[in-house]
Amino acid sequence: MSLLIFSAILAVLFFWAVGAYNRLVLLRAGVAKQFAAVDAQLLRVLVWLQGNLPASMRDMLSEMEEAALPEALLKNERDLNLLKILEDLSDSLDVARTQPLSAIAMQKVNQDRLALAAWAKAEVRAGQTGEPTWFIEPLPYKFDRLKAQAWPLMDAYNQAVTKYNDAVTQFPASMLAKQVKFLPAQMLDNADLLA
């Protein structure tokens, strides 16, 4: 009789573990799917911005991997900073694409995305004070529009992360998550530095 009870308890635990694991895997897949949409929109922003670079900067951007940038050819420090930000954001998106639940990868995406927004804000201010800049109307408007299209996607990603993180930290699924090394995911910061 006790063997039957023990077997029943083991069976319940086994089926619970399989169900909990499947739920966690589905939630992880949901986070990855939502990040794919965010990634696609951020890539649109990158491609659009790279396509609107002055020709001399576009040529340098394509040669960045082969040699150091000739700083003398750049108009100002802000242009050099933009090329670095674009390269960093592209690299961080590449990493996050392969590890959409990695907190470190998402922190880097957040950092680089916000650095791009800060660059745009500095360029708009520079244009308003009469400093030379190629980032003039209608470019800031279009940049803001592309960024705004990413916000609902980032909200959907953050909601998926919240569901996943709740499941990973909720007892008793948290014990299973620790066993299979499912860590909480990082949310995207959807603060707007241009507001």
Indicate residue ranges for each PLM-predicted region.
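A helix-centric hydrophobic-segment signal that preferentially recognizes long
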Residues: 2-195
